[in-house]
């Protein structure tokens, strides 16, 4: 058995943890096995009740140890799985926190970028609003200054104006429609120098003011505002038409002067209407207001013309301002050619009057001297003022503004044909109702910026033609032809300027559109870049997330494979351990069986020696029949007591020991019965008292007597049954064999 323990320990030496855990239990099992298989010499002095203290069978303890080890391994594996699960959960929690942190950072970054864009957009809007406010304030200041400057010279000119009494006639209101028409031809026929002076008063003074150079440097929008200020309104055109009709019938050179209050109210009503509205809708609203008040203005002006008194005002002379103009006007007049078809008026005038004519013309009003650049409307506007809103609405390229053109006065060379007729104009003023001094007749050849868009030379020619017609000294057809020629030139100039202005506006509009398109393209490009960047970032994050998930999935699969591999290895190790235990058990059983057979052989040898000694003792003794019977009876009683002693400590197996004892003692009884039968049956006391005492003291010695009795009673029972040794794989007979061995040893001793 020591070899078994050593072999078991050597076999378990390669298991590591299993060996360390099961070492104490294996030592206990080994001690129990050693205690159960000690040699017979170690327990020779023990009593018969020694069999009651035998340990439990080793295989039962081995099964408990296996169950306990399996339970411990199972608990250890559960602990490892729980720890691994905790590690997985912690790793997933860290990954989730990292992903949430990444999302928070990205969201914060996008929010900061959006706020930055909002702040930048708000700053741009604020700058734009401030710039618009500054432009608006500057424009309002320019308009205010322009209105102030346009009103001051008008008041001053009203003081310079002079006029005579009008010949009121009832035919003013009943004039034919041709004379009330607004067309250029009809107005040009009845133009009077006084009307020319009135029409050119504000514009000529304003455009010839000292700060003209500074105002010409304004922006295009400001220039358009100033040009609209200088554009004549419908009421102005109505007044001009009425004045032309009156001057044609009365043939008077006296200017008609509107009272200051009426002029001031007209300016205060008309001009704010031009600038309160935005630039795009200003012309349309102005035209609507002007059309609505057209008839009222005509009637009021006619009444004023009829009720105004004849006044005379001396035009103040400013030598510093008029000296260059006089030089421009009169220096070229010495070599001027006469108009074709116009006779030289020399016979009807005395030489003194001819010489006095230049002196009378010398002090002209400021509108006669300087070439005036005037902003007026196009000819089609003047033909039908009622249809003006429709025409303005059909011109989207001008953005609702009325077409404005600039008419420059002709230079000194263009005015040369009308200069020789200034002299004859002086005597024609003698029949006037209000006599005027010689210097006062000079304002007659004033430039006429009338609604017919004629220049100063044309008005001068028309005025002189009308005077000569009354005097019978000038051909009106020639004057009309010259006027038409100058109107044609002026119209061509206007058309040219209009084309240039439209081209300039078109260029500006294209520039604005290109700028807006470029800004929109830049904004679109920025948005596309931002969207592409966001898409790329999202794609990158998605790819990273997919890669991370793939890595985690691969890690989980690898861990699952490792766990399955470890589980398989554990199961294989358990199977190997079970196989090893089974082999050890088989080896153990084989060794026990071998030892049992050896003990059986030793017992047989002992029994043979015992039978030989008994046979020799019986042969030498002389016995009697009564003693033998008595001894047999005594032996039977002792034999009957023997099974009680042997069956009591049998641990619930009382059947096995009698069979074993019987099997071991069968040969003894078989061999001893012939000797007993051969003994002489004699009366008296037997000689074998000492041997009988020995048999009484040793219970094993009484077995042959009991067997003899049983054999004599039932001869059918075989004397040597071998059934007890056929089942060599059972564990039950092993303790009984040990009990038999101890009894036989005691018998031998």
UniProtKB/Swiss-Prot annotation:
Q: Which InterPro entries match?
A: MAP7_domain-containing, MAP7_fam
- Record location of the Glycyl lysine isopeptide (Lys-Gly) (interchain with G-Cter in SUMO2) cross-link: 273, 295, 373, 377, 406
Q: What is its main location?
A: cytoplasm
**Region Disordered: start-end pairs:** 1-91, 104-180, 307-688, 702-723
Top-rank taxon = Eukaryota
Q: Where do Polar residues bias regions lie?
A: 36-52, 307-320, 461-473, 660-672
Q: What induces it?
A: Up-regulated upon terminal differentiation of primary keratinocytes.
Q: Where in the cell is it found?
A: Cytoplasm, Perinuclear region; Basolateral cell membrane; Cytoplasm, Cytoskeleton
Q: How is it modified after translation?
A: The association with microtubules is regulated by phosphorylation during the cell cycle. During interphase only phosphorylated on serine. Phosphorylated on threonine in mitosis.
UniProt key word Ion transport: no
Which molecular-function annotation in GO is an example for this chain? Answer: signaling receptor binding
Q: Which residues cross the membrane?
A: none
Relate the protein's function as given in its record: Microtubule-stabilizing protein that may play an important role during reorganization of microtubules during polarization and differentiation of epithelial cells. Associates with microtubules in a dynamic manner. May play a role in the formation of intercellular contacts. Colocalization with TRPV4 results in the redistribution of TRPV4 toward the membrane and may link cytoskeletal microfilaments.
Per the similarity annotation, which family is this?
Belongs to the MAP7 family.
Q: What is this protein called?
A: Ensconsin
Name the gene that codes for it.
Answer: MAP7
């Amino acid at each position: 058995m020591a070899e078994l323990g050593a072999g078991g320990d050597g076999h378990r030496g390669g298991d590591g943890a299993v060996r360390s855990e099961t070492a104490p239990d294996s030592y206990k099992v080994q001690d129990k096995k050693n205690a159960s298989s000690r040699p017979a010499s170690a327990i020779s002095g023990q009593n018969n009740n020694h069999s009651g203290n035998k340990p439990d069978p080793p295989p039962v303890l081995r099964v408990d140890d296996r169950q306990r080890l399996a339970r411990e391994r199972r608990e250890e594996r559960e602990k490892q799985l729980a720890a691994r699960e905790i590690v997985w959960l912690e790793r997933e929690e860290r990954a989730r926190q990292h992903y949430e942190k990444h999302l928070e950072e990205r969201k914060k970054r996008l929010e900061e970028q959006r706020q930055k864009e909002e702040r930048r957009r708000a700053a741009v809007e604020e700058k734009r609003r401030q710039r618009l406010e500054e432009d608006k304030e500057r424009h309002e200041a320019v308009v205010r200054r322009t209105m102030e400057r346009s009103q001051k010279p008008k008041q001053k000119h009203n003081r310079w104006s002079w006029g005579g009494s009008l010949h009121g006639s009832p035919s003013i209101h009943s004039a034919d429609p041709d004379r009330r028409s607004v067309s250029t031809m009809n107005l040009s026929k009845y133009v009077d120098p006084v009307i020319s002076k009135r029409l050119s008063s504000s514009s000529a003074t304003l455009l010839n003011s000292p700060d003209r150079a500074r105002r010409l440097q304004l922006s295009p929008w400001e220039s358009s505002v100033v040009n609209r200020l200088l554009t004549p309104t419908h009421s102005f055109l109505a007044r001009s038409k009425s004045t032309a009709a009156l001057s044609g019938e009365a043939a008077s050179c006296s200017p008609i002067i509107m009272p200051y209050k009426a002029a001031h109210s007209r300016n205060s009503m008309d001009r704010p209407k031009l600038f309160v509205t935005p630039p795009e809708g200003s012309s349309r609203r102005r035209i609507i207001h002007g059309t609505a008040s057209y008839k009222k203005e005509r009637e009021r002006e006619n009444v004023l013309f009829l009720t105004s008194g004849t006044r005379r005002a001396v035009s103040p002379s400013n030598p510093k301002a008029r000296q260059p103009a006089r030089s421009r006007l009169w220096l070229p007049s010495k070599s001027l050619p006469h108009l074709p078809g116009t006779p030289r008026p020399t016979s009807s005038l005395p030489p003194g009057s001819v010489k006095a004519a230049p002196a009378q013309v010398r002090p002209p009003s400021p509108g006669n001297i300087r070439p005036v650049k005037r902003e007026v409307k196009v000819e089609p506007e003047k033909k039908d003022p009622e249809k003006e809103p429709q025409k303005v609405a059909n011109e989207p390229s001008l953005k609702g503004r009325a077409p404005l053109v600039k008419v420059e006065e002709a230079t000194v060379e263009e005015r040369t044909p009308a200069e020789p007729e200034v002299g004859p104009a002086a005597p024609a003023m003698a029949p006037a109702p209000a006599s005027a001094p010689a210097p006062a007749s000079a304002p007659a050849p004033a430039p006429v910026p009338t609604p017919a868009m004629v220049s100063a030379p044309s008005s001068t020619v028309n005025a002189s033609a009308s005077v000569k017609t009354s005097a019978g000294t000038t051909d009106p057809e020639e004057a009309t032809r010259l006027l038409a020629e100058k109107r044609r030139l002026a119209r061509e100039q206007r058309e040219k300027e209009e084309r240039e202005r439209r081209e300039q506006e078109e260029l500006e509009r294209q520039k604005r559109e290109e700028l807006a398109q470029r800004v929109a393209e830049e904004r679109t490009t920025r948005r596309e870049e931002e969207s592409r960047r966001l898409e790329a970032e999202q794609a990158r994050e998605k790819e990273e997330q997919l890669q991370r998930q793939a890595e985690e999935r691969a890690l989980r699969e690898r861990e699952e494979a490792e766990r399955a591999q470890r589980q398989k290895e554990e199961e294989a190790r358990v199977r190997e351990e079970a196989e090893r235990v089974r082999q050890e058990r088989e080896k153990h059983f084989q060794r026990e069986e071998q030892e049992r057979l050896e003990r059986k052989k030793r017992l047989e040898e002992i029994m043979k020696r015992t039978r030989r000694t008994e046979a020799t003792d019986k042969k030498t003794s002389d016995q009697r029949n009564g003693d033998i019977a008595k001894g047999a009876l005594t032996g039977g009683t002792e034999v009957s007591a023997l099974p009680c002693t042997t069956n009591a400590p049998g641990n619930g197996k009382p059947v096995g020991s009698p069979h074993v004892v019987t099997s071991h003692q069968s040969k003894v009884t078989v061999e001893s019965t012939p000797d007993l039968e051969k003994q002489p049956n004699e009366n008296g006391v037997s000689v074998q008292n000492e041997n009988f005492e020995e048999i009484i003291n040793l219970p094993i010695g009484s077995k042959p007597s009991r067997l003899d009795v049983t054999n004599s009673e039932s001869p059918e029972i075989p004397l040597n049954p071998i059934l007890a040794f056929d089942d060599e794989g059972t564990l039950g007979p092993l303790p009984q064999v040990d009990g038999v061995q101890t009894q036989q040893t005691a018998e031998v001793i």
